[in-house]
């Protein structure tokens, strides 16, 4: 398993190699990243995935505690992860679908504890959403402890994995609480396919708008394209072209130079289980896992890190492996750390298979039973040690025979005193080796033996002879008194002089000890152990097997003979009592041949307190609608005297989708369960209700579990602990230099309320539509001397998060522990969903009545819908009223009622179920009145005929007068004084644009328009020679009024007259039936404002920035917009709301004039309501429009200049820093926008021409195009209106006639024709200074092409019959 750390030089080296070969190894523009990416702590590290197509290794995303908005992060290039994907504790991440929309294959070449996909403790994750994930080649999945994760029961993992038996999916949000809805099921038009899982045949999807992809059965095990065409057999996951192994998303076997192949071609080698590389590539890969290695090797046509078992490199410079003769030699050792310390079986395991140890061998094994066999398995092959061998304090060793193949100690490095073999203080060592079958040589250096009471001196002398060291040792090197002699005595007492304690360390010093001959004082040994009671002795815990409960530390003599010796004991447990004593190690003899030494008395000392660990096994259950019972177990490590607990709780917002969906379909109502566990708590104030089975059976009891079930649960619990330990050990990297932050101190700074017996003062309105976005405060309470509490005064049937913190006696200084938490829901309150107060009714026209009723004040969670039962004789009719409809109208309308007496009752439905029916309300529907006698008809008929004739005469007169006035008019448009009026002439009549409803298919939501939701879909036969066309489908809300529906269709009717490449096309209308649909050309890149903002360079992008548009691209956008507006102008239409938000960007980046009004709800803040009028786009309006409500083509040109400013600033808000009222005054007083930073002069001069205060001084759209036509792309000539046959130059007689129509305005027009082509002085900044008309010093000519046209041609803006496009809905202009 690879390390979990993300940074490090090996990763950098891998990255350099992969980057250099990426273009030749993968057909896309992305890179191969590896050998693993670890993203932790900072969400901005996700930028490392920017260009990754394949991650050759693992991907970790974990430990990001600060909730962030991940919607701006999207990595569509990533398609394959060759090892595994791990997500752990990433706050704020709600779905993986936007993050990795095209992740298709997880190969599982190496696994994380047998899993290829691990999602663990992701508290905010709502769905997985990897809708393009098709294959997990090896390994299982583990999805655990994700409290808000849904859409797990709707995924058929058998379509992704070969076997699902090892999958582990537990501890997530219960499926009954999720209300998982696959696309189309709510509208009863399901879009997903069905499969059977656990005998349930159901739809399969990833999210509410993403189905799970299934290939046709004819493909078998082959992948398929998005259009369900079978891929080549060598493709895995998906492909772009059927039966083509060069367009696979991933390869089933191996990838080589853009082609998926079943085996690597000759001269290439398998690498990382998925691709083929050549020899040069393999030779240049650094071996990240072994500093001693010479790089990767080639064996059995595979490029790998090391030779397999039984093989060895044939030379140090070769990349190839050869079979070993006998055991394979293996050199071990570290150039930096030359001494290999063996203090446990784990450390010995690092020498498994080693035959030559380059360096020194230090054996220090103090405890362990039957450890010799383990050491022989791991160290038995060692033959040569190049340095020294030192064996000390190894009380578990009886013999050194586990080094059964050791034959040579070179002694190239020696201990002080020239020792190459050093044996000190091994209490149970009895034998070195069997010298009858051993040949060991110590080539250089001496031997030293001391304090081995069970090792005979004769054994030592035998080793002298065999190893050839006899004569090298002095008399003191092999002491006959302390080897082989168990007796020892200490005549002097050492006294401790000082002790200093921390939570995990102790410093002790003792007085200077001076034996008669100071040279015989070798060192000190400190013994210490945990001692809960002060009753330990020196010999506790020692036995013949070498077990010793005392820990020992060697202490060298202080360099200063006068200094006091001391030791720092570290790695201790907080708030733990330790017993400590010290021995002096000497060689001094007394007359009776006993060792003379010194020893201290046993000292008892306690470490300081520390922050406790978290409480364990937190459980919660509800015993009433306002109480939650919470129980937990004490922490494993109190690290002090446990004093109290802090209990904190927070109300959780409802799921957002509950506010959006219409739950009038009974089978779609989400189910919630309260915390119904059983906890033995003395404070329970309400007797829980016992479920009765009926009859004499008495209360229902759970069946006892069988022994097999208990054993299975036990094994599963053990396996779960092993996995969690493995997870934490793999991903948590120690950072000793980092200071720990106090959890409770941080938490307490954000608390909004605190009380020992807290009452939740909940004043939030449950019906607030924004409630699901509310962050509720935490409340807290202190619990003393017990591990349980009851939280009271809670809301009924509401979900709460409960955090428990442990606190010991030092909590005021150190803080409390981190929290362990649980989610629990209170019980529903009886009667909470009942509708209070009376139900009233109001008569309405056309045999209708309107019922009104109050909403439940404190319902069980959330009211989802209301049901009305009504009838004249019996209540046999039902009407469902959604939550959204009730909030909009405050009641419901019953239509098409027959005359007579009626009764009605109403019932509310919440998350917990149904409330009670209201008392019946009685109402009467009168019959329609009829003429009482025939005379009324005789009298009324002539009157009606006269009225009709009079009306026709008035209409003819008005029409004639309007036509005459239009001939004399100036082409201006005035805002209506009664914009809410509409006549019968506005009613929409179906025509040749009508499309059959069955030809339309909706796929996904694109956004909210002025009248309703806009969807992406497919239409059949709406475009000539195209069987199917991707389209945008505009809808009108179900609750829309008749006027709104007519406006919706009339707005579409306006678009019927347009046929221009740079104006979004109308493709059809579906007006028959409900809902009404308008079919538009699909603009895949959205509105221009959003597109421009997506091009903004982000801060700290690590050299991976999106490139803002160049000058040529800006000019191209401007020309395309101007061409669309010129077309509207030629057809005598005035737009009135030209802005970047109302321009759309096509797939090929062409900018077009949008379908007017689609973006009103999205950019509501761009509009301003002046007085009691409708919404006005004041920041884009010309001075004359703001003053007089006048809208002409000239005012559209002003707005066009603002659009140019938006393009140059990447859609900043115009007049930033000014309120709407200030903008109103500023523009009317002559103020202009600043020149944007880094704006080209050419573009800004064009803006200034559009912002002439005198409307007649502004250029026309045709003149604007003429000034920049040379900068446009060649394709512009082929598609534009400017170069089309429709754009014919006007006849001279027509120009003269139009000039004669406006004599009253000629005094404000300069007589010099060149004035029309000159720029104005630079406008003032936001200081309020006005921009004067006319040329000034330093003016520049914008384009000579202005002069090529007839002088004053751009002044001819007042044209006969000029019409205006309607502003978006709710505007009165």
Curated annotation (Swiss-Prot):
Stretches assigned to the Protein kinase domain: 1000-1276
Disulfide bonds: 33-52, 150-178, 182-205, 192-211, 215-224, 219-230, 231-239, 235-248, 251-260, 264-276, 282-303, 307-321, 324-328, 332-354, 456-489
PTM entry text: Autophosphorylated on tyrosine residues in response to ligand binding. Autophosphorylation occurs in trans, i.e. one subunit of the dimeric receptor phosphorylates tyrosine residues on the other subunit. Autophosphorylation occurs in a sequential manner; Tyr-1167 is predominantly phosphorylated first, followed by phosphorylation of Tyr-1163 and Tyr-1168. While every single phosphorylation increases kinase activity, all three tyrosine residues in the kinase activation loop (Tyr-1163, Tyr-1167 and Tyr-1168) have to be phosphorylated for optimal activity.
Reaction it catalyzes: L-tyrosyl-[protein] + ATP = O-phospho-L-tyrosyl-[protein] + ADP + H(+)
Side of membrane Extracellular, spans: 742-936
Subcellular location: Cell membrane
UniProt biased composition (Basic and acidic residues): 1323-1332
Biased composition (Acidic residues): 1292-1305
Fibronectin type-III domain boundaries: 490-610, 611-709, 735-829, 835-928
Subunit structure: Tetramer of 2 alpha and 2 beta chains linked by disulfide bonds. The alpha chains contribute to the formation of the ligand-binding domain, while the beta chain carries the kinase domain. Interacts with PIK3R1 and with the PTB/PID domains of IRS1 and SHC1 in vitro when autophosphorylated on tyrosine residues. Forms a hybrid receptor with INSR, the hybrid is a tetramer consisting of 1 alpha chain and 1 beta chain of INSR and 1 alpha chain and 1 beta chain of IGF1R. Interacts with ARRB1 and ARRB2. Interacts with GRB10. Interacts with RACK1. Interacts with SOCS1, SOCS2 and SOCS3.
Function recorded in the entry: Receptor tyrosine kinase which mediates actions of insulin-like growth factor 1 (IGF1). Binds IGF1 with high affinity and IGF2 and insulin (INS) with a lower affinity. The activated IGF1R is involved in cell growth and survival control. IGF1R is crucial for tumor transformation and survival of malignant cell. Ligand binding activates the receptor kinase, leading to receptor autophosphorylation, and tyrosines phosphorylation of multiple substrates, that function as signaling adapter proteins including, the insulin-receptor substrates (IRS1/2), Shc and 14-3-3 proteins.
Family: Belongs to the protein kinase superfamily. Tyr protein kinase family. Insulin receptor subfamily.
Protein name: Insulin-like growth factor 1 receptor
């Amino acid at each position: 398993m690879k390390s979990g750390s993300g940074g490090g030089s090996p990763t950098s080296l891998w990255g350099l190699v992969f980057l250099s070969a990426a273009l030749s190894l993968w057909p896309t523009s992305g890179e191969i990243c590896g050998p693993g990416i670890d993203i932790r702590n900072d969400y901005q590290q996700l930028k490392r995935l920017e260009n990754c197509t394949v991650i050759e290794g693992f991907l970790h995303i974990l430990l990001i505690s600060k909730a962030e908005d991940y919607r701006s992060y999207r990595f569509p290039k990533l398609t394959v992860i060759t090892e595994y994907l791990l997500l752990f504790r990433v706050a704020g991440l709600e779905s993986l679908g936007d993050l990795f929309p095209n992740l298709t294959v997880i190969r599982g070449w190496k696994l994380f504890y047998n899993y290829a996909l691990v999602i663990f403790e992701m508290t905010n994750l709502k769905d997985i959403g990897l809708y393009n994930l098709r294959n997990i080649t090896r390994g299982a999945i583990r999805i655990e402890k994700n409290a808000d994760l849904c859409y797990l029961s709707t995924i058929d993992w058998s379509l992704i994995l070969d076997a699902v038996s090892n999958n582990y999916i537990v501890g997530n949000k219960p499926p009954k609480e999720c209300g998982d809805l696959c696309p189309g099921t709510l509208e009863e038009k399901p879009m997903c396919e069905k499969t059977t899982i656990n005998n349930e045949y159901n739809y399969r999807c990833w999210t509410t708008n993403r189905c799970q992809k299934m290939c046709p059965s004819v493909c078998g095990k082959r992948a398929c394209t998005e259009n369900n065409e079978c891929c080549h057999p060598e493709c895995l996951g998906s492909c772009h072209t059927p039966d083509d192994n060069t367009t696979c998303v991933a390869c089933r076997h191996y990838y080589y130079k853009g082609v998926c192949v079943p085996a690597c071609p000759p001269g290439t080698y398998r690498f990382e289980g998925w691709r083929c590389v050549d020899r040069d590539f393999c030779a240049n890969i650094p071996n990240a896992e072994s500093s001693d290695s010479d790089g990767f090797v080639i064996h059995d046509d595979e490029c790998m890190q090391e030779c397999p078992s039984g093989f060895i490199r044939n030379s140090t410079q070769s990349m190839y492996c050869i079979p070993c003769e006998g055991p394979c030699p293996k050199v071990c050792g570290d150039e930096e750390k030359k001494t290999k310390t063996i203090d446990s079986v784990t450390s010995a395991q690092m020498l498994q298979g080693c035959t030559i140890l380059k360096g020194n061998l230090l054996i220090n094994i103090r405890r362990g039973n039957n450890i010799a066999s383990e050491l022989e398995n791991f160290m038995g092959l060692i033959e040569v040690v190049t340095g020294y061998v030192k064996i000390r304090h190894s009380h578990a060793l009886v013999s050194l025979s586990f080094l059964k193949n050791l034959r040579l100690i070179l002694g190239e490095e020696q201990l002080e005193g020239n020792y190459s073999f050093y044996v000190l203080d091994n209490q149970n060592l009895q034998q070195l080796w069997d010298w009858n079958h051993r040949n060991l040589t110590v080539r250089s250096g001496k031997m030293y033996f001391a304090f081995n009471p069970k090792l005979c001196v004769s054994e030592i002398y035998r080793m002298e002879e065999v190893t050839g060291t006899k004569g090298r040792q002095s008399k003191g090197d092999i002491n006959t008194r302390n080897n082989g002699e168990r007796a020892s005595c200490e005549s002097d007492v050492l006294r401790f002089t000082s002790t200093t304690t921390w939570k995990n360390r102790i410093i002790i010093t003792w007085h200077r000890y001076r034996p008669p001959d100071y040279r015989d004082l070798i060192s000190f040994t400190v013994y210490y152990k945990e001692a809960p009671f002060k009753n330990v002795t020196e010999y506790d815990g020692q036995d013949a097997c070498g077990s010793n409960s005392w820990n020992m530390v060697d202490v060298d003599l202080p360099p200063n003979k006068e200094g006091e010796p001391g030791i720092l004991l570290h790695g201790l447990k907080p708030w733990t009592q330790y017993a400590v004593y010290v021995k002096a190690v000497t060689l001094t003899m007394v007359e009776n041949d006993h060792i003379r030494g010194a020893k201290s008395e046993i000292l008892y000392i306690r470490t300081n307190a520390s922050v406790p660990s978290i409480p364990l096994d937190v459980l919660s259950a509800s015993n009433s609608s306002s109480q939650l019972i919470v129980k937990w177990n004490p922490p494993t490590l109190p690290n002090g005297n446990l004093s109290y607990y802090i209990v904190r709780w927070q109300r959780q917002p409802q799921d957002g989708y509950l506010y959006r969906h219409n739950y009038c379909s009974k089978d779609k109502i989400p189910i919630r369960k309260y915390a119904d566990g059983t906890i033995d708590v003395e404070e329970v104030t309400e007797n829980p209700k016992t479920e009765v089975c009926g009859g004499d059976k008495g209360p229902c009891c759970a069946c006892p579990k069988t022994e097999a079930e208990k054993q299975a649960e036990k094994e599963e619990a053990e396996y779960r602990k092993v996995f969690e330990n493995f997870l934490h050990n793999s991903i948590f990297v120690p950072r000793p230099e980092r200071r720990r932050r106090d959890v409770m101190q941080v938490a307490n700074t954000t608390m909004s309320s605190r009380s020992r017996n807290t009452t939740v003062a909940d004043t939030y309105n449950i019906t607030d539509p924004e409630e699901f976005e509310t962050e509720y405060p935490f409340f807290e309470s202190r619990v003393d001397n017990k591990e349980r509490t009851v939280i009271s005064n809670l809301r009924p049937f509401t979900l709460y998060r409960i955090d428990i913190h442990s606190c010991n006696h030092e909590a005021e200084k150190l803080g409390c522990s981190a929290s362990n938490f649980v989610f629990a829901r209170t019980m529903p309150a009886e009667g909470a969903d009942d509708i209070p107060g009376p139900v009233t009714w109001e008569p309405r026209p056309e045999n209708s009545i309107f019922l009104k009723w109050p909403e439940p004040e404190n319902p069980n969670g959330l009211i989802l819908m209301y049901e009305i039962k009504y009838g004249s004789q019996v209540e046999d009719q039902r009407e469902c009223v959604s939550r959204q409809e009730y909030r909009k109208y405050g009641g419901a309308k019953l239509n098409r009622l027959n005359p007579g007496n009626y009764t009605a009752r109403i019932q509310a439905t919440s998350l917990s179920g149904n409330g009670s029916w209201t008392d019946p309300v009685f109402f009467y529907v009168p019959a329609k009145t009829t003429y009482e006698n025939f005379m009324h008809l005789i009298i009324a008929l002539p009157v009606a005929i006269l009225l009709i004739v009079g009306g026709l005469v008035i209409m003819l007169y008005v029409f004639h007068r309007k036509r005459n006035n239009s001939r004399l008019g100036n082409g201006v448009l005035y805002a209506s004084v009664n914009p809410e009026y509409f006549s019968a002439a506005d009613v929409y009549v179906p025509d040749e644009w009508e499309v059959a409803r069955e030809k339309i298919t909706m796929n996904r939501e694109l956004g909210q328009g002025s009248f309703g939701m806009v969807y992406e879909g497919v239409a059949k036969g709406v475009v000539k020679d195209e069987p199917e066309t991707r389209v945008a489908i505009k809808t009108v809300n179900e609750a829309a009024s008749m006027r709104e529906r007519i406006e919706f269709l009339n707005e579409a009717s306006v678009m019927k007259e347009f046929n221009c490449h740079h104006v979004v096309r109308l493709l059809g209308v579906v007006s028959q039936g409900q809902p009404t649909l308008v079919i538009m050309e699909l603009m895949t890149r959205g509105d221009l404002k959003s597109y421009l903002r997506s091009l903004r360079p982000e801060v700290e992008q690590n050299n991976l920035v999106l490139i803002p548009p160049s000058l040529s691209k800006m000019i191209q956008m401007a020309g395309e917009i101007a061409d669309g507006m010129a077309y509207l102008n030629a057809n005598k239409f005035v737009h009135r709301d030209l802005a970047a938000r109302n321009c759309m960007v096509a797939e090929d980046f062409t900018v077009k004039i949008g379908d007017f009004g689609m973006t009103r709800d999205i950019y509501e803040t761009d509009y301003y309501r002046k007085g009691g009028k409708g919404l006005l786009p004041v920041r884009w309006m010309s001075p004359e429009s703001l003053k007089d409500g006048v809208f002409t083509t000239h005012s559209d040109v002003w707005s066009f200049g603002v659009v140019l400013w938006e393009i140059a600033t990447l859609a900043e808000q115009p007049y930033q820093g000014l309120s709407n009222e200030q903008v109103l005054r500023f523009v009317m007083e002559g103020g202009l926008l600043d020149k944007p930073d880094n704006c080209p002069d050419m573009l800004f001069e064009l803006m200034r021409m559009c912002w002439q205060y005198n409307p007649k001084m502004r250029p026309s759209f045709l003149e604007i195009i003429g000034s920049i036509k040379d900068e446009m792309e060649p394709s512009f000539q082929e598609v534009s209106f400017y170069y089309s046959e429709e754009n014919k130059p006007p006849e001279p007689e027509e120009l003269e006639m139009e000039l004669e129509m406006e004599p009253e305005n000629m005094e404000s027009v300069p007589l010099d024709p060149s004035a029309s082509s000159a720029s104005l002085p630079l406008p003032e900044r936001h200081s309020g200074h006005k921009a004067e008309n006319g040329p000034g010093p330093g003016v520049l000519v914008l384009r000579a092409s202005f002069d090529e046209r007839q002088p004053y041609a751009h002044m001819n803006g007042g044209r006969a019959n000029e019409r205006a496009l309607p502003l978006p809905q709710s505007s009165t202009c």
